[in-house]
Amino acid sequence: MRLPFWFLLAVVLSMELAVTQGLQCHLCKGFGGCSRPSSCPWSSTHCVIIATRSPISFTDLPLVTKMCYSGCPDVSSLGLGPHVSIACCQSNLCNRD
């Protein structure tokens, strides 16, 4: 069975479009927060925010890291202490705040 050229072209173009529509997250690091939208690798399923506060002074702004991640890590699996909080989400640019 021969498929028409226009049909094959439509399939190829739709595959290309799907490749460019992966998860997008903010990827950045800064005190108090940051914002830089970026496309994630295909292995990433979550956008993550990690906030780290100084154990000496809780009045300082936290160091905030935003990134793509495959899965949702928890503090204990990363070996991080009680001064770290992690939030995960699964939609585009959901790790804004």
From Swiss-Prot:
GO terms for cellular component: extracellular space; synapse. Disulfide bonds join 25-47, 28-34, 40-68, 72-88, 89-94. GO terms for molecular function: acetylcholine receptor binding; acetylcholine receptor regulator activity. CDD domains: TFP_LU_ECD_SLURP2 (cd23561). Keywords: Disulfide bond, Secreted, Signal. SUPFAM superfamilies: Snake toxin-like. Residues 24-72 form the UPAR/Ly6 domain. Residues 1-22 form the signal peptide. It comes from the Eukaryota. The keyword Disulfide bond applies. Its main location: secreted. Pfam families: UPAR_LY6. Interacts with CHRNA3, CHRNA4, CHRNA5, CHRNA7, CHRNB2 and CHRNB4. Interacts with CHRM1 and CHRM3 probably in an allosteric manner. Binds and may modulate the functional properties of nicotinic and muscarinic acetylcholine receptors. May regulate keratinocytes proliferation, differentiation and apoptosis. In vitro moderately inhibits ACh-evoked currents of alpha-3:beta-2-containing nAChRs, strongly these of alpha-4:beta-2-containing nAChRs, modulates alpha-7-containing nAChRs, and inhibits nicotine-induced signaling probably implicating alpha-3:beta-4-containing nAChRs. Proposed to act on alpha-3:beta-2 and alpha-7 nAChRs in an orthosteric, and on mAChRs, such as CHRM1 and CHRM3, in an allosteric manner. This is Secreted Ly-6/uPAR domain-containing protein 2. The gene is Slurp2.
